[in-house]
Amino acid sequence: IFAGDAYKDRSPAPTFQREWGKRIIRLSQAKIPTLLLVGNHDLSPAIGRAHAIQEFDTLQVPFVRVLQKPDFLHPEDLWDLPVQVMAMPWISRSGLMAATGETDSTEAFTRVEENIGNLVEKWLEESDPSLPIILTAHASIEGAKFGGERLVMLGNDLVLSAGLVKNKKLNYVA
């Protein structure tokens, strides 16, 4: 599971794309299931433009799945692996505001955070209790302490509640 930001920005140099591609293809050729979550550095600010890891989805690379929208994956979606994965890729502020019609980004994020909590609860109710559940998200966690590199980020992150990621039904959070 790769939880987003394959590159430092949304327009990677061809050399970086080549080297990243070589590594993903090695995983594919070894038949190692790989989930690539789209992160904020992978996305263009313009709605409708391709993201930086789009080629793996477009080319339908075997054993590689690109996750660009919230999804609950079951074994049949995961090459019959005995696991369930809840995927939360980055949700852009502009895309979110366009989708909700909100003009206040704080209110838009608050609404989405509530909806994500409700969606995860719904997925947990639908889950198979005999299989492990992984939550993977490209988001900040309420109350988390970040390293020094985090200080350069702007304050527009989607924030998941600590209670959500500490849910006892989740076996792993990435």
Label every PLM stretch briefly.
Residues 33-35, 132-134, 172:
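Beta-sheet entry/capping signal
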Residues 48-158:
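Conserved catalytic scaffold of divalent metal-dependent phosphoesterases
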Residues 135, 164-174:
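Contiguous mid-protein beta-loop-alpha structural module that forms a pocket-lining wall or clamp
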Residues 15-21, 151-160:
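Charged helix-capping and loop-helix junction motifs
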Residues 40, 115-118, 156, 167, ...:
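Detector for Asparagine
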Residues 1-75, 165-168:
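Core catalytic region of metal-dependent phosphoesterases/phosphodiesterases
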